[in-house]
Amino acid sequence: MKKYLITCLSLVLLVFLGDYLYYENGNLYLHQKGEVTCFTGSDRESLYLDQGSGLEKFEIKGVDLNFGKPGYFSTEGAITEEEYLRWFQQIQTLGANTIRIYTIADPVFYEAFYQYNNNNLKPLYLIQGVWVDEYLSNSSCSALSDEFSQPFLTECKNAVDVIHGRKKIRESGHVFPVRYKRDISSWVYGYILGTEWEGDLVAFTNESDASVSQYNGDYLYTENAENFEIFLAAIGDQTIQ
């Protein structure tokens, strides 16, 4: 009996540990690692998308989607999967091919997006935005400071994990964390890191430190860049990693 209880307890602990490492910590990566590939591209004049026949020119015909609904706050997650599915159909009927959202949505949005694209030969594409803390954006701090950059980088990485269906996020008003389990990465055209950057934040960052080195990362680098541009390159590079 004692061995049985120890075994059961060990299994429960392993399940909780695996759940934490996979959905919250992110260090448990079970998918096979191979060559990094990308189905989108760009040059100085055009955007490209690979829809099965190699990269071809792609014109984004986009719709901004917010999460408000009459009678509810946008943070309440009141929109149902059926409503999202109907909206996606109407958006595509308009002739649009891409949806932009400004921040991480409720799991229902990603579930509906997954179901819609799985059941349609012509999918919609998503541009995932990352929200910026409005309080910090209007505070007297540099974007290069840990106070600003670390929470923003965490939010960027959260967005990537959400898109790949491996994230739990603890939100106010929820007893338990909300879980994102649908991998929609094959329909994500790109990310927009940040919303409308405050001019004061940009100016303060550029003027706050004259000794900031140019950034040379694994995927992004800068040359003769201002401090704020260096910040954006560093955040983008670390998000890709």
Name each region found by the language model.
Residues E111, N119-Q241:
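Active-site region of glycoside hydrolase catalytic domains
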Residues M1-L13:
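N-terminal Sec-pathway targeting helices
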Residues Y20-Q90:
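N-terminal carbohydrate-binding accessory modules
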Residues K57, T93-G95, S185:
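Alpha-helix termination/capping residues and helix-transition junctions
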Residues E59-L65, N97-I101, L126-V130, Y191-L193:
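Hydrophobic faces of well-ordered beta-strands that scaffold small-molecule active sites
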Residues V12-Y22:
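Hydrophobic alpha-helical membrane-insertion segments, chiefly the h-region
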